[in-house]
Amino acid sequence: MEYWIAALLLLNGLVVAQETSGLSLRTHIALPNVDGRMDHLSVDIKGQRLFSSALGNNTVEVIDLQSGKRVRTLPGLAEPQGLFFDASTNRLYAANGVDGSTRIFDGATFQLLDTVKFSDDADNIRYDARSRSVIVGYGGEKGLRGRPQGSGALGILDSSGKLSREIVVDAHPESFQLEKTGTRVFANVPDKQEVQVADFVKGTILARWPTTVARTCFPMALDEAHHRLFIGCRAPARLLVIDTESGRTVASTEIVGDTDDLFYDAARSRIYVIGGQGFIDALQQKDPDHYERIAHYATPPGTRTGLFVPEWGKLFAAVPHRGEQRSEILEYDAK
């Protein structure tokens, strides 16, 4: 009897630990009349605004986080994917999959200021604060879209929004991350089943790291302090941890399926993985080579993109409209 009581108390303790660690759902933000798949997000820290790509709706949704309401819809886009709000210029960049354009909007009036035309499939966007450059991944082979073989690239826009140069990769680049203290950029190239490493300044490819443990590498996050790169794979669904000094895979752990966004929370040594299978995973970094899944939060199916805002300790996840399931943004507090 004492054994069973002890076991029950231990089980209860584990359940409580999972409920009180990781993430806490704070609120739902409704997005009425938004149909189809959702894609990536960006944030205006000072203005407390969230921007969400509604790919299937061909719109960008503007959300006031103080009121918890959508305040504007930007129509007429062409499957918007990546977004970036540049606080230094008060401009919003929106990358479009269908026509390859990146459209630049005034962050106050949302007037279209400029359009940068890439060859095809403008996707993820990143920012390099040192050079004040906006980087757009685009083009190339992409098996999921049935597109032909060809090179992809990272297009680098200067502070005025003009294309200044490109870094060519072997196929379509999915998620990519830049070092803040170094000069390397890491890019997932799933149609080649590898991570390609480039010198951001010289524009040359330095290395190609095969993702042999798992394939179809899409989201990525970087722990620069510990020289660790986190890769979200879909076939099978696993998180790969790569040593950025050697290119060696040092850890592999099971994660939610159909992931399209993952984030590293440096303050809590934690990784959040958003998957369309219908869960958000929280994994604790025990040390640079060891990771434990501490929580597995249920979400509406198809919720696979989001944004972690370290300044606020918040994670946002984008829910698509499917049947009776309405489009919305889930807001979580990291604990």
Model-predicted segments: where are they?
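Bacterial N-terminal signal peptides
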Residues: 2-13
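Predominantly soluble domains enriched in secretory-pathway, periplasmic, or organellar proteins
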Residues: 17-335
